Amino acid sequence: MKLYYIDRKTGERKEEIVAGDRYLKWMYGTASGNSILELIAKKKIFSSVYGRLQDTSSSKRKISRFIKELQIDMDEAERRNPEEYKNFNDFFARTLRKESRPITKDPEVLISPADGRVFAYEHIDMNKVVQVKGSTYRLMDLFQNNELAREYDGGVCMVIRLCPADYHRFHFPDGGVVNYTKKIEGNYYSVNPIALKKIAQIYCQNKREISLFQSNNFGQMVLMEVGATCVGSIVQTYKEGQSVEKGEEKGYFKFGGSTVILFLKKGAVKIDRDLIENTEKHIETKVHMGEGIGRI
């Protein structure tokens, strides 16, 4: 199955280069692969061991090939030479030059917290939030908090899927304060569209971290990071209870594809129409951290 997205800068429909495409098709599309998935690959131990391997000095050998195969633009990175990284995870969580991701300063504009491919949903039903076409989940199962789920009924949900080629640090979409972050243990299914179509309620099943964020301009919002197969860990770099600026780093993922999800309350923001229209056509839109995705 080929994956396509809309390049927001050009409006072009492009094919995604999928890392481990054959592996994903076997794992999620065959009986033998599914057996391995359920017995081993979805377990924490598998992703933990794989993640530790990416911290070894020998993993550095993969970096140049990875850059070439996934066509990663290293001119954006602070350290452009692959030899400057001590291991693969060091490269995977690479930082970018500030000019590579300019932050939209307008206080009325909500910015994307991450690079990735986005689906955007307005007027969500707390009992039927869309995972993919024909598959839904309940907010109370995702949040594990019924009262919080009710607060976001009728609001906005934005799902930003990061593939292995992307910049894997995530940032704050507005200035404000994080009141708390809750860690929820779970499985480590892939969040690739191939898996999303096969496994029901993946976001509710996978490991995730939920932050309640009091923003300066858009009210309270939920910021969520979802782990996936081979994601060594989700690392939070902010300090709880401390004021942060718009675009400031919140944390990063170690190796693997992963997802960042934003929830805003009803009436808090108007999502940009191109994102909504592409979602209605069941196609993701490529966005970059720091660019506007909605406004008051």
UniProtKB/Swiss-Prot annotation:
Localization, UniProt = Cell membrane
The enzyme's E.C. designation = 4.1.1.65
Q: Which GO terms describe its molecular function?
A: phosphatidylserine decarboxylase activity
- Pathway it belongs to? Phospholipid metabolism; phosphatidylethanolamine biosynthesis; phosphatidylethanolamine from CDP-diacylglycerol: step 2/2
Q: What kind of modification does the protein receive after translation?
A: Is synthesized initially as an inactive proenzyme. Formation of the active enzyme involves a self-maturation process in which the active site pyruvoyl group is generated from an internal serine residue via an autocatalytic post-translational modification. Two non-identical subunits are generated from the proenzyme in this reaction, and the pyruvate is formed at the N-terminus of the alpha chain, which is derived from the carboxyl end of the proenzyme.
Chief place of localization: membrane
The residues annotated as the active site are 115, 171, 258
This protein's membrane topology, according to the annotation, is: Peripheral membrane protein
Q: Name one GO cellular component term.
A: plasma membrane
Q: What's a BP term from Gene Ontology annotated to this protein?
A: phosphatidylethanolamine biosynthetic process
Feature type site, description Cleavage (non-hydrolytic): 257-258
Quickly give the catalysed reaction: a 1,2-diacyl-sn-glycero-3-phospho-L-serine + H(+) = a 1,2-diacyl-sn-glycero-3-phosphoethanolamine + CO2
The Pyruvic acid (Ser) modification is found at 258
Which InterPro entries does the record cross-reference, listed alphabetically? PS_Dcarbxylase, PSD-B, PSD_type2_pro
Cofactor binding comment, as recorded: Binds 1 pyruvoyl group covalently per subunit.
Family assignment from sequence similarity: Belongs to the phosphatidylserine decarboxylase family. PSD-B subfamily. Prokaryotic type II sub-subfamily.
Role this protein plays: Catalyzes the formation of phosphatidylethanolamine (PtdEtn) from phosphatidylserine (PtdSer).
Q: Which NCBIfam families match?
A: PRK00723.1, PS_decarb
Q: Which HAMAP family match?
A: PS_decarb_PSD_B_type2 (MF_00663)
Record protein name field: Phosphatidylserine decarboxylase proenzyme
Q: Which organism is it from?
A: Alkaliphilus oremlandii (strain OhILAs) (Clostridium oremlandii (strain OhILAs))
